[in-house]
From Swiss-Prot:
Cofactor note: Binds 1 zinc ion.
PROSITE patterns assigned: CYT_DCMP_DEAMINASES_1 (PS00903), CYT_DCMP_DEAMINASES_2 (PS51747)
Originating species: Erwinia tasmaniensis (strain DSM 17950 / CFBP 7177 / CIP 109463 / NCPPB 4357 / Et1/99)
CDD domains: cytidine_deaminase
Function: This enzyme scavenges exogenous and endogenous cytidine and 2'-deoxycytidine for UMP synthesis.
Any one GO molecular function term: identical protein binding
NCBIfam families in alphabetical order: cyt_deam_dimer, PRK09027.1
Entry's family note: Belongs to the cytidine and deoxycytidylate deaminase family.
SUPFAM superfamilies: Cytidine deaminase-like
Transmembrane regions listed in the UniProt entry: none
Protein name (record): Cytidine deaminase
Length: 296
């Protein structure tokens, strides 16, 4: 079990500890619990979906990287598949606040990058800020997404974001977590291929500036993130943050990044290059290359 979970794990009931210890102790645990594993825990502990998600919140919050605020937020997203995805806030010393990742963004993007096609609900230990409410409004679940908070009845995103503005107001029909293929040709080494594959599935209906980032750590592991645009623009999540999110939830250290590849279209209306380079430099990685997208 990763050391970061030990304090939160100690607060769980003995029965839940017994049920979840094998999952957390698995060498390949990467911050998500499969539908089959979740069903087993629920059956063993007599919990429903909502109760299990709430009990997992301290474990999700333990994944937070919050050197600026010292305020750990955890989220658990439940995919339509039944898989549970951890999310936690991330902050980066030496970068701007605009580069931070909110826990809800973390959980949603985690599910998306793992291939989930839609969310049934999300459970958070603190009320979602307006930024996150707007971010979640880009999802294909729309305002019907169920949000659960401690001490409150479950409510929809529409309850927390009345009179919302979203992709449908801009006649966008392909929503976040919908399956997409931009026809980008794969090429290069494994890290470059991962960045291109991420760009191929990115969500950029407003700018058309598809992009993906792939990171390689000291262990040789590769983590790739996709650009997730938002109808309100500012809540958009850059591809680097998606990759950093997977790396962190996978139990690796941000200081272990050795190489980075950004794949983006030449001559696009916007570029991720400067912001990605600045954030990576703050994390100690200066080996960033940019490769163009080529259509098949």
């Amino acid at each position: 079990m990763h050391p970061r979970f030990q304090t939160a794990f100690a607060t769980l009931s003995p029965l839940l500890q017994q049920a979840i210890r094998p999952i957390l102790s698995s060498a390949d645990f990467a911050g998500f619990i499969s539908a089959q594993q979740a069903d087993g825990v629920k059956q063993q502990c007599g919990l429903d979906d909502s109760e299990l998600a709430f009990t997992l919140l301290p474990l999700a919050a333990a994944c937070a990287v919050a050197p600026l605020s010292d305020f750990n937020v955890g989220a658990v997203a439940r995919g339509k598949s039944g898989t549970l995805y951890f999310g936690a806030n991330m902050e980066f010393v030496g970068a701007t606040m605009q580069q931070t990742v909110h826990a809800e963004q973390s959980a949603v993007t985690h599910a998306w990058l793992r291939g989930e096609s839609g969310l049934a609900g999300i459970t958070v230990n603190y009320t979602p800020c307006g930024h996150c409410r707007q971010f979640m409004n880009e999802l294909n679940s729309g305002t019907d997404l169920t949000i659960e908070l401690p001490g409150r009845a479950a409510a929809t995103l529409g309850h927390y974001l009345p009179d919302s503005f979203g992709p449908r107001d801009l006649a966008i029909t392909t929503l976040l977590m919908d399956e997409v293929d931009h026809g980008i040709a794969p090429r290069g080494d494994k890290l470059e291929q991962a960045a291109l594959a991420a760009a191929n599935q990115s969500h950029a209906p407003y700018s058309g500036a598809c992009s993906g980032v792939a990171l390689q750590t000291r262990s040789g592991a590769i983590y790739a993130g996709r650009y997730a645009e938002n109808a309100a623009f500012n809540p958009s999540l850059p591809p680097l943050q998606g990759a950093l999110n997977l790396l962190n939830l996978g139990g690796e250290e941000l200081s272990d990044i050795r190489r980075a590849v950004l794949a983006e279209a030449s001559g696009a209306k916007l570029s991720q290059r400067s912001a990605s380079a600045a954030t990576l430099a703050a994390l100690g990685c200066h080996d960033l290359i940019t490769i163009p997208l080529v259509k098949m």
